Design a protein with these regions (language model features):
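Receiver (REC) domain active-site loop signature in two-component systems and cognate sites
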Residues: 56
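Acidic, metal-coordinating helix/loop segments flanking the phosphotransfer/catalytic sites
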Residues: 32-49
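Active-site residues of response regulator receiver
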Residues: 53, 83
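Two-component/phosphorelay signaling modules centered on CheY-like receiver
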Residues: 12-30
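C-terminal output helix
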Residues: 107-116
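Conserved acidic segment of CheY-like receiver
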Residues: 2-12, 18-19, 50
């Protein structure tokens, strides 16, 4: 059975690029914000990996990560954070809070694919 990736990013172009490169090997569920992603998760869906942007409307990605890691239902799902911020302190903080990886935007799609494969296969 194909693995499922939940992608949360308010930029539709990121979703399209990720779907092109990851969609051949994985099922992708996309939401433009964390609120809709949480609603989907609370319907009983369990992805094998979550990829989330940090800067989003409604609920920031770091708040989304914190919610996931504090919730028994979701705490074991690996999360990759995406950001255009090159802040070392932010990367360290998010990794300490439970993110398994932090990828800077713009990213190389092949690099994303390799990082995803290392985490969920």
């Amino acid at each position: 059975m194909r693995k499922l990736i939940l992608l949360v990013d308010d930029k539709e172009t990121i979703a399209k690029v990720a779907s092109i490169y990851l969609g051949k090997d994985y099922d992708i569920q996309y939401f433009p914000d964390s609120i809709h992603a949480l609603e989907w998760l609370h319907e009983g869906k369990t992805p094998d990996l979550i990829i989330s942007d940090i800067r989003m409307p409604l609920m920031r990605g770091d708040e989304f990560l914190h919610y996931l890691k504090c919730n028994e239902l979701f705490k074991d799902i690996p999360v990759i954070m995406l950001s255009s911020e090159e802040s070392t302190s932010e990367r360290i903080r998010l990794l300490q809070e439970g993110a398994v990886d932090y990828i800077l935007k713009p990213f190389n799609p092949m690099e994303l694919k390799i990082r995803v494969k290392k985490i969920i296969e």
